[in-house]
C-alpha cells in the first residue's frame, strides 16, 4: 500500500457529502452536482484505491473488510479542512459512528435512497462490488439495507432517487445547498 491522504486546493464553498446504499446514484449524481455547483468531485472509493495502490476487490481479498473500513476512515479524515467538493462515499462509509461524525464535520450530508427493486435493477450484472460477490441475493441485500438504515438516516437531506432523473436529483440537492450555505 502506498501514498498519502491529501485533498488539495480548498475553495470557499461548503462540501456536499453523498451517502447511500450501492446503486442509489452517488457517483453519477455527484459528478453532475459538482459541475453544477462549480465544486470538485471526489469519489471516496477512488481515493482509497489511489492510496492503497490496489483495487477495492484486492483490498477485500488480501486484507479483508476491516482493513478496507480503516482505509475508508483515513480517507474521510482527509476531508477535514477542505471545502468546495462533492464527495461520493462508499455504501458502507456511514456504518462506523466515527465516520458519520467526520462526514458531518466535512459538510452537508445528503443521503440518496432507492427501493431494493430499483437497486437490484441498477446493479444487474455488476460484479465489481465486493459485497455483491458474497451477499448477492435479494434477501441478503435487503438485510444489509435494513441494517444500515439508521446510519443512512443521519443526514441533512434524504432523497429517493427512484423515478427521478439525475438532473432532477441534482437540482434538488443544489437548491438545498444554496439554502444552507
Curated annotation (Swiss-Prot):
Substrate binds at residues 45, 69, 91, 148. PROSITE patterns: SHIKIMATE_KINASE (PS01128). One of its GO terms (biological process) is chorismate biosynthetic process. It is an enzyme of class 2 (transferase). Its main location: cytoplasm. Its EC number is 2.7.1.71. Keywords: Amino-acid biosynthesis, Aromatic amino acid biosynthesis, ATP-binding, Cytoplasm, Kinase, Magnesium, Metal-binding, Nucleotide-binding, Transferase. Catalyzes the specific phosphorylation of the 3-hydroxyl group of shikimic acid using ATP as a cosubstrate. This is Shikimate kinase. It comes from Geobacter sulfurreducens (strain ATCC 51573 / DSM 12127 / PCA).
